[in-house]
């Protein structure tokens, strides 16, 4: 995809690094695959704040993404590559041979005019979705299901990818982007290739206003608050705040948050790297 670094004509432009939109081929989404999205401002149904530092931002429409890829054996042509405000990756609009339309996450290398397919008969090529049992060992994959037919849950953000490293009976062993190595049922589907827009990690907003466009409000440190607002607040003058804690009082560094008897722990061969 590439990035753009702007000339320092204003203070907000000086450090601004944004993604290039040269690969995007359509500016308006497919009308049948979008729906209005109501912002919550970080409040729940009773109006209480449940998530801090969220609010405002530009209006967005949600694009329905096909994470299940259930139309097996039906070829689809890539019609457009589009921007999606709801995720870091780009999305691709597919026109199926039977007339159906769907959005998928656009993998790196997928272009307008390419043909993709899903199912066990599909070739292990970029953009095709196959059961893990049919994917060769060593292949780079993304959009991985945790349970068969559930839809892709893992490895969906821009530039991310996992690798199928080996097979163990009815399971395959996959190395995740975090470094975690885990087993997944071989009947689960995954898509070949890595997620596109890999330069997303290099972007810099350049100014606070661009964060506000995305619905992100100023994030205040606990140590500058009052004791009534945060466990690390208060004190005469500038204080360290003591042992780092979250607003709820939980230790912020080193505390294990994973349930000790979680069912899925038996599938994890090697924990993620710090």
Curated annotation (Swiss-Prot):
GO terms for biological process: cytoplasmic translation. Keywords: Ribonucleoprotein, Ribosomal protein, RNA-binding, rRNA-binding. Residues 207-220, 244-274 have a biased composition (Basic residues). One of its GO terms (cellular component) is large ribosomal subunit. The keyword RNA-binding applies. Residues 197-274 are annotated as: Disordered. InterPro entries: NA-bd_OB-fold (IPR012340), Rib_uL2_dom2 (IPR014722), Ribosomal_uL2 (IPR002171), Ribosomal_uL2_bac/org-type (IPR005880), Ribosomal_uL2_C (IPR022669), Ribosomal_uL2_CS (IPR022671), Ribosomal_uL2_dom3 (IPR014726), Ribosomal_uL2_RNA-bd_dom (IPR022666). GO terms for molecular function: rRNA binding; structural constituent of ribosome; transferase activity. Part of the 50S ribosomal subunit. Forms a bridge to the 30S subunit in the 70S ribosome. Belongs to the universal ribosomal protein uL2 family. One of the primary rRNA binding proteins. Required for association of the 30S and 50S subunits to form the 70S ribosome, for tRNA binding and peptide bond formation. It has been suggested to have peptidyltransferase activity; this is somewhat controversial. Makes several contacts with the 16S rRNA in the 70S ribosome. This is Large ribosomal subunit protein uL2. It comes from Porphyromonas gingivalis (strain ATCC BAA-308 / W83). The lineage of its organism: Bacteria, Pseudomonadati, Bacteroidota, Bacteroidia, Bacteroidales.
């Amino acid at each position: 995809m590439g990035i753009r670094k702007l000339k320092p004509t204003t203070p907000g432009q000086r450090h601004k690094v944004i993604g290039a939109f040269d690969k995007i081929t359509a500016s308006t989404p497919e009308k049948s695959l979008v729906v209005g999205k109501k912002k919550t401002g970080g409040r729940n149904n009773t109006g209480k704040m449940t998530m801090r530092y969220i609010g405002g931002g530009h209006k967005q429409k949600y694009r329905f993404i096909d994470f299940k890829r259930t139309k097996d054996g039906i070829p689809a042509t890539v019609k457009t590559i589009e921007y999606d405000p709801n995720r870091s990756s780009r999305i691709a609009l597919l026109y199926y041979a039977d007339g159906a339309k769907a959005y998928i996450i656009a993998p790196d290398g997928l272009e307008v005019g390419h043909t993709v397919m899903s199912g066990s008969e599909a070739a292990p090529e970029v953009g095709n979705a196959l059961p893990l049992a049919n994917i060769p060992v060593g292949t780079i994959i993304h959009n991985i299901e945790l349970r068969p037919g559930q839809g892709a849950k893992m490895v969906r953000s821009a530039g991310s990818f996992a690798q199928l490293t080996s097979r163990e009976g009815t399971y395959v062993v996959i190395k995740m982007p975090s470094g975690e190595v885990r087993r997944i049922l071989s009947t689960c589907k995954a898509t070949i290739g890595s997620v596109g827009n890999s330069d997303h990690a290099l972007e810099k907003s350049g100014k606070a206003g661009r964060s506000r466009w995305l619905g992100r409000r100023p994030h205040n440190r606990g140590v500058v608050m009052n004791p009534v607002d945060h466990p690390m607040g208060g004190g005469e003058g500038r204080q360290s705040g003591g042992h780092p804690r979250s607003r709820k009082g939980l230790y912020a560094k080193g505390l294990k948050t994973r349930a000790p008897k979680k069912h899925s722990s038996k599938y994890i061969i090697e924990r993620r790297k710090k």
